[in-house]
Amino acid sequence: MSAGGAGGGEGRAPFARFTDQVCGQILFRPAHRRVREELTAHLEANAYEGAQVHFIGHLQTNKVNKVVGKVDLIHSVDSERLLRAIDRQADRLGLVQDVLLEVNVAGELSKGGCTPDEAWELAQLAQSLEHVRLRGLMAIPPIAQKPGDNTPYFSIMKKLYVDIKEKIAHNQDDMDCLSMGMSGDYEDAIAQGATLVRVGTALFGPRPPMAKQ
């Protein structure tokens, strides 16, 4: 479960406490530059010790060293370059980093993510690397205007997830995460097999605007 972005202002502080104390999970989608900087500083300071921390959002290859080994799961691997960079950093640290492949299931130009065909290639690569563990797939479809709008996209993701798990994964038990669905469509996502949803707006209302620097 995710608020869609923690650390984005005082209005989101209750969510961070809620996930830390009740769920034991903090999931970040650092869409704003200042939020990314604050998150990086908190990770380096090990401020979330004891919580399960997930990273959602674009991860630059030059920032991999600030995230690998400091979060439990990276949701947004979408290129060979990034996957190999994560593997190299995990190798340096002597650990295995859990990752999800981000799939741009609707082919939206404004969003990151690989194509479904590229997901097959990245999944095969992940199986050959020693210091990453592929846990599943992640997708962020278009904003749903009404119930059922995103069911076709969720169905595509479920099939892709099952096919990759059955045909590529060396250990199918490792492939246990299908991260998709937000406040407007999480019920449809769960109906299609989602294991992780991001419902911060449904729980706590709209995110307050970022203060201008």
How would you label these PLM feature ranges?
Residues G8-P30:
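Conserved small-domain helix->loop->beta segment predominantly found in fold-type I
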Residues G193-T195, G200:
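Active-site-proximal glycine-rich helix-loop-beta segment
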Residues R12, H32-G184, I190-Q192, F204-P206:
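Conserved alpha/beta-domain cores
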Residues M210-Q213:
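Active-site loop ensemble at the mouth of alpha/beta enzyme cores that anchors a bound cofactor
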Residues M1-G4, F18-C23, V35:
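Catalytic lobes of large eukaryotic enzymes
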